[in-house]
Amino acid sequence: MARWIPTKRQKYGVAIYNYNASQDVELSLQIGDTVHILEMYEGWYRGYALQNRSKKGIFPETYIHLKEATVEDGGQHETVIPGELPLVQELTNTLREWAVIWRKLYVNNKVTLFRQLQQMTYSLIEWRSQILSGTLPKDELAELKKKVTAKIDHGNRMLGLDLVVRDDNGNILDPDETSTVALFRAHEVASKRIEEKIQEEKSILQNLDLRGQAIFSTVHTYGLYVNFKNFVCNIGEDAELFIALYDPDQSTFISENYLIRWGSNGMPKEIEKLNNLQAVFTDLSSTDLIRPRISLVCQIVRVGRMELKEGKKHTCGLRRPFGVAVMDISDIVHGKVDDEEKQHFIPFQQIAMETYIRQRQLIMSPLITSHVIGENEPLTSVLNKVIAAKEVNHKGQGLWVSLKLLPGDLTQVQKNFSHLVDRSTAIARKMGFPEIILPGDVRNDIYVTLIHGEFDKGKKKTPKNVEVTMSVFDEEGNLLEKAIHPGAGYEGVSEYKSVVYYQVKQPCWYETVKVFIAIEEVTRCHIRFTFRHRSSQESRDKSERAFGVAFVKLMNADGTTLQDGRHDLVVYKGDNKKMEDAKYYLTLPGTKAELEEKELQASKNPSVFTPSKDSTKDSFQIATLICSTKLTQNVDLLGLLNWRSNSQNIKHNLKKLMEVDGGEIVKFLQDTLDALFNIMMEMSDNETYDFLVFDALVFIISLIGDIKFQHFNPVLETYIYKHFSATLAHVKLSKVLNFYVANAEDPSKTELLFAALKALKYLFRFIIQSRVLYLRFYGQSEDGDEFNDSIRQLFLAFNTLMDRPLEEAVKIKGAALKYLPSIINDVKLVFDPMELSVLFCKFIQSIPDNQLVRQKLNCMTKIVESSLFQQAECREVLLPLLTDQLSGQLDDHSTKPDHEASSQLLSNILEVLDRTDVGPTSAHVQLIMERLLRRINRTVIGMSRQSPHIGSFVACMIAVLRQMEDSHYSHYISTFKTRQDIIDFLMETFIMFKDLIGKNVYAKDWMVMNMTQNRVFLRAINQFAEVLTKSFMDQASFELQLWNNYFHLAVAFLTHESLQLETFSEAKRNKIVKKYGDMRKEIGFRIRDMWYNLGPHKIKFIPSMVGPILEVTLTPEVELRKATIPIFFDMMQCEFNLSGNGNFHMFENELITKLDQEVEGGRGDEQYKVLLEKLLLEHCRKHKYLANSGEAFAFLVSSLLENLLDYRTIIIHDESKENRMSCTVNVLNFYKDKKREDIYIRYLYKLRDLHRDCENYTEAAYTLLLHAELLQWSDKPCVPHLLQRDSYYVYTQQELKEKLYQEIISYFDKGKMWEKAIKLSKELAETYESKVFDYEGLGSLLKKRALFYENIIKAMRPQPEYFAVGYYGQGFPSFLRNKIFIYRGKEYERREDFSLRLLTQFPNAEKMTSTTPPGEDIKSSPKQYLQCFTVKPVMSLPPSYKDKPVPEQILNYYRANEVQQFSYSRPFRKGEKDPENEFATMWIERTTYRTAYTFPGILKWFEAKEISVEEISPLENAIETMELTNERVSNCVQQHAWDHSLSVHPLSMLLSGIVDPAVMGGFSNYEKAFFTEKYLQEHPEDQEKVELLKRLIALQIPLLTEGIRIHGEKLTEQLKPLHARLSSCFRELKEKVEKLYGVITLPPSMTERKPSRAGSMVLPYILSSTLRRLSVTSVASSVISTSSNSSDNASSRPGSDGSILEPLFERRASSGARVEDLPPKEDSENRISKFKRKDWNLSKSQVIAEKAPEPDVMSPGKKTQRPKSLQLVDSRLTPFHSPSPLQSTALSPPPLTPKATRTLSSPSLQTDGLTASVPPPPPPKSKPYESSQRNSAEIAPPLPVRRDSKAPPPPPPKARKSGILSSEPGSQ
């Protein structure tokens, strides 16, 4: 059978396609995933993706590209390491890590960072490909490596990832192979480098000067890249463009010219140069770049005829000035602008050609008028005036160029900017040397500038048109070909012709050309200038011959080169042939200076010189500048170099050498040094020369130390080791040096000695090399001791010098300390290292204490850096001295320790001791440990965390601890003399470690440094833990504080953020685990062991250690949790056994407190909850005494954790404030039950803040009230936990309670809960009045209370709606899951808005359309289902309002507040559907919800704890509907009767809807359904209810009669047709009803106003139950009979009209209570009715009639009378007296229901447009305008309005008529 074969070669690969697994055994892969392959089988591999090692699976072989890899630990635990270059691996890992972050940036919409990372990623991918290609040369690969690592480091910093530390070659440092100090320094360097890079990029973006300054400080040479794009100018002839850099402030050219030859066709003359005209101006130094202004100037010279308009017969080929173009490039050069792509336009300014100045020099710019520039003004002036001109009239003509500043010399520029600078790029050099002269830069450029001339016009009437021709000849008169270079970009020319100015007597040219001649030719060459007049007529021009000649020799007679500067040349005239004969004219003086000198000589000797008679009339001036590395213009230097031929001047020349320019000396460095040593050796008899040569040598060494010549250091080194050969120089040099040091007090020698000390390093190299050569030639001869003695003598002289008082020669002392160590490595070659070490020790000891401290420390640092310290035997000598000096510096009593220098010295010592190639170091580490460890610790403890040296000292401390072996630790402890010393040391160390762990010294991204610190600390902590166990464990020696510090340190270490692996990316996590393991486990297990070691001492750590141990157990590492959670049980057991109380309350309270803090701080998870409960239960159940209490505690903690985790999850992840509040309340209740007031109060304020943020002021007040309830009105002091978080400064409970009450009252006021505010203010007023006697406060409080009373009556207060919400499904959090909550809506919030708000909180929830309770399938579903519908609050009126006439505004409050019961009605059909009358089978299901708490409360919602469901029959529904209709009519009639100003429209609509059969359809549905014989036979029990329904129909007629009457009174012209229609319909209706159901007449008082108290409106209100009684009660005075012969006239006494309403007052007032005389069988109906009626939105204007009870009905001793009955007489209802119980029982009405709490005044009626939560309307369908949900005052009948629109209340009535039915209009 085939089987899977382990792979051997195929170990590592990359997925090249996406692979989606179709089975569990398969492994899904994405392109780019790397896989470790374990086995293979028939085209399949088995293995895992390196991104997720836990999931193994199979995948197709063809999907994988195999790569080379090495396998480590072969077998089951093998790991693969890719075989790629380390850099490629790093690139790959970086790209993988960045890719994850890149996606997150996109998701989080961080566009800028996303784009930056995208660009960086693309760069890295491209570079990775280049490296993998393997085609790069070694140097390019090294360069690319630098770019890659810089980019990675910058990207990591940008993304907040860890800093990668590297060696000099860019390889990642391995912390195991690197010393701690080197690691620290590498971090510093990397951090600084990245910071500089970021700053540079920022300044580029901000165009700041910073960038330039940063570059200038590091780079010394620059190039300016110019790309010439186009030249737009209509010349019509060829032109030459000379582009150069110019300093307008100095009026000097900085660079040579870049020449472009432009054709007459508007293209370059050489067509191949099209689009390829570019140049680099090199050698610019930082001093050039910081010039205030730099311009790029272009001079355009026309090559053609004298004037443009001239014809063919005129002379052509003349070079004529045409114009200039100038651009200020200061911003580009200063680094403010850097965009090589941007094209700059340089406007061109042409020379004016006006005829009236033809006789003058041409003017360069049309903007500069002729009288501004004089005719002989030089070009620099013209340029400067052009630069000064602000506007340019360029007419679109000019040059287009792009520019870029390139850092580096020419070689660097060509290398770094190869995309810009190639072989075709012209190189224009600076006219002068760069800031740094490179030894290999051979240059021999002679710049010649034609300045001006003056030429006699001779026989001509006008000045000549002079052309100067310049060429180079040797002394034989041979022309040097192509020696003259007019500009870069073209080869040289043999002749250079100047520009011709037209008829100018004194032409100024300012044309510069470069002459390039081989060095060996220079001595033989001269430059010749020929002058010729050029005619504009070709024929005449041909006949013109040169009229003059001038020349200049390049070498002076003394061998020096022609001096820089201006030279006036002699112009010779005469025979052309003679003038062209070099042998002839070279015998004549070339310059005026030579001429004058020869004339002077001639005056002495007349026969010597006879110049031409014409030679002095014309003048010609040039300027020269020589940039040569081989020619000197210095006569003194030349004299020294040729000292043998001029030996008498040696002393003079040696002295003069100090004045020679450095540039001249370095050119001839080797020759100069040879001359010096030759003089020293050959003139050895004369000691004077020794000193002069020594000083000259010092001068040259100092010169090369200058930054300008720093690159000549290698040249000097090469000279010393390759060319220097003076074997006895060491004798003379050391003798002079000794003399200088010994005579340091001589002021004349001070400067010389100081210079010698600065040059000491190279002086000694000469001395030692001389000695080495001597020994090589002569062997160790007798003078061996002489040399050694001279070295000893030198040190002795230095020691004497250092011991002198500080004021003297402080500069010399400092220099000695600074430069003396630099000789060590050289001296060691020829001098005994041990003795040298001793000499240096004595040298250091010779310096008095507290003098030159820093210099001394720096000197010792350099000694340590030398190779001397790397020799073990030398270290034995030096280290004790170094540690003593450091000990003195770090001593506690040291006044001003130099921390910087000390840390530098200490770091260097430790770095050397960490090396493996320096011999044995153990004893040296021990020495440092003994003498310095505690000093270092104390320095760290005492140093500010902001100190720049803290990092360095901590690194030193880590280094010492890291280098200590186990034996060192035990030895160190043994060095302490007393036990107290050990305690002090351990205390210091523990405190310091904890402080360093708590406040990171190193940046977070210094991951390697931080992990190194952690690893070293861990080992040290464990070492010291052993000391604790051994020395401080038993009863006698136990140190509580020490152990306590140990535990706190260990916990701080374990919980340190750098060790929390789960917070890191997978890549980082794997990296850390692989390198360091999980250190938390190691320290955690040690904590556990140390705890169990404590034995009986444990009780001392309870409860203080509960918090720290909890932190340990909360670490999300399962093994660690399992190991440490049992410590809790141990603590419980310990307290139980040892506290003496037989409980573990201390532990319990502490655990609850700390658990709350930790979970809120983000620690803990579901797994922890389960594990904690499980482990505690396991241990407790095994314990004899803790079984019960322990088990209870385990469940308690588990419950607390559940609440806390829910709370935290919601707080962190859920933006819903409601969910946050729910969780807060759950936690709150838990702590309330546990009587943990401290935490309870904390969460109260969290809840208060949440409410305040949501503007739930009422709920915020109720929340604060819970805090206030914990306080007493007493002078007891406030314990700290009672004080609130944002505490008032109070001392007693009474003060705090008062402050809280004031805050609560203000919240109630904001929430319009004035009733509650009044209640609290009464309590507070009592305190003010009778306890604290604060009358001022009382007055203020009473004013507020008065305002609250006024607000209740007058202010508008919208009633909130209530909603039932069911959360079904397992997708909801546990505190919501499968529960129903009642929500109190916000002001004016409708159900639709509320639903939307809910769905926003739960975007994944599905909204249920049905209001029926869902089934189990939905409840157990993993989804979220939301059910939401409106419920009606059931009013619960306080007993104090019973039997009292309460104003409507007061009652309104109780309709929606202080409620706990809510109802919801849902219509449904029962039985067979009747197609003719659907109403007959329409039942109502009424659900009642009772909440856990009363509304409003501390939340805007509470859970429904009780739910009951009842059904209401169609008949009862009909009765309710009829009652509601009658109520509506009654209320509307009352309102209109009471307030005539009300709009008549609502009344019109109401009446129209009832009386118009076209609208309503009459009562036929009821008649068909209930008034049939068949129904009564089937439902005999409904007889009474049917009769009641008939009477309700009958009762409607008198109400409608009153309504029609009022409608008639308030009639407008528009409404007359409507009123006529209403009257007609009503007559028909009335006739029908009275005929079928009898007549009821209302008493006249029903429609009268009653007088009320001023300021309030008391509106008598008739309930439907009252109206019902009107239809059945037989009361003589209750009916106005139309019959004159009424039988019981006598009983109609005054006041008896109230008897009808007497039972009403009592029953309304106790609307929520059961009326005691109701028949028992009616209770259920009453309850059903109550819920049903509450579903209607009740009026806000209901009040209770103000009426004194009749004595016979309401007297105290009597029971409430039942309503009396009515009897039918002649189809009319006639009242009669009958107290008969039979009658009253037979005709007693249905039970009184809480319809008593309802009113239906027109502004708020909501009977139409019913939702599913309310019963349907009466059978006839209403029209749109029937809706009674409208404003009674303002809205016309046809327009429906929003249900919640409210009219402001009218002013109170002036007077009140007596009446029964009336209502306050519009009151809301």
From Swiss-Prot:
Region Disordered: start-end pairs: 1681-1730, 1742-1868
Residue list for modification Phosphothreonine: T1793
InterPro entries, per database record: ARM-type_fold, C2_DOCK-type_domain, C2_domain_sf, DHR2_DOCK5, DOCK, DOCK1_5_SH3, DOCK_C_lobe_A, DOCK_C_lobe_C
Organism: Mus musculus
GO CC term (a single one): cytosol
Modified residues (N6-acetyllysine): K818
Lineage start: Eukaryota, Metazoa, Chordata, Craniata, Vertebrata
Protein name: Dedicator of cytokinesis protein 5
Subunit record text: Interacts with CRK and CRKL. Interacts (via N-terminus) with tensin TNS3 (via N-terminus); the interaction increases DOCK5 guanine nucleotide exchange activity towards Rac. Interacts with ELMO1.
